[in-house]
Amino acid sequence: QWVEENKRKVQHWFFSTDLTFYIKGGRVTKTAGFVGTMLSICPLLHVNYEGKLIPVQKVRTKKKVIEAIEKKMEELAENGLAYDGKCYISHSACQADAEAVASLVESRFPNLNGRVLINSIGTTIGSHTGPGTVALFFWGEERKS
């Protein structure tokens, strides 16, 4: 019962720096993928109320998307910048990007300093997103429909 009551409070935010697998999977057209790659577009996505992956924002450059994902955490984390709950980062063959997100999160959320855990994305999810994907998970506001 607790899980059912709280499952929508887990925030899932993702970005990808490589659109190749999105093109191969049919989620992005070849033309859009080519243009997106040329412009260094990194989509910012999240899991909605129904558990579906939703594109939220198209951000230019890796540096800016790392800042954008951290801003989402500031906006949605339980207790804002005073958040002291669990924080996980997963990545698909981009450890340095995951570490950059962790470093930024730890610098802005003082209670998390040294407590952000980084893991690899599993093969099932990784086969859909490909390399260059970073996911940020934390406890926050309930996801609405």
What are these regions (language model features)?
Residues Q1-S145:
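Mixed-charge interfacial surface used for oligomerization/domain docking
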